[in-house]
Amino acid sequence: FSALVAAKTLSFEEALLLVSLRAKFMQEAVPEGEGAIAAIIGLSYKELNTICQSISNEGSLVELANINSSNQIVISGSKEAVDIAILRSTEAGAKRAILLPMSVPAHCKLMKPASERFKVVLNSINMQEPKCSVIQNVDASETNNVAKISENLISQIYSPVRWTDIMNSFNQLTLGKCIECGPGKVLSGLMKKALKDTEIISLDEYESFLDKENLI
């Protein structure tokens, strides 16, 4: 959403409204305590996806929710299924399998009801054509098509965040510099490992914006 504000597709006020309602709808989609999220480190995409599909086929849903790197992936789903996935991931050789302190099982199919409610609100917003291309979580490809952007905003609620693919898109664009804006330096750390020839800068505090305001 911040990227869409920067691209002039959404106003700051529209983005605040959408982010607030999106969070509300996601929180209300699954009763508290029935969903869970966990980080799995040390298994490949294929290995972890096989585990999740096997558990889901047994009746309770768990899916890949955030592909941060080749061996650092977040899973999301019902509490029961995520607990089983943590156990099976550990048995399969994961270095770490940690339940995260989040009650909303984001980026999995349990969020489809939230996406339907969000769609109604989003359709009431008159989004503008972006001043520059944006790359979204769902397909990790460049677009300046408003209809596609809207479609992706809806589907990303229940679809995985393809961060590794996004970094690959950055790499193909041969960017000389990537700047992470926001709290923490997690994405900067991941980009430094993946984008060897790109300068990575993190602006995670107010003072850092003042120090580096002329970098762009």
Model-derived regions: residue spans:
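Alpha/beta catalytic cores of group-transfer enzymes, especially the acyltransferase/condensing modules
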Residues: V5-Y158
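Acyltransferase/transacylase module recognition
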Residues: N123-I216
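Short helix immediately C-terminal to the catalytic nucleophile in hydrolase catalytic domains
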Residues: S2-A6, S188
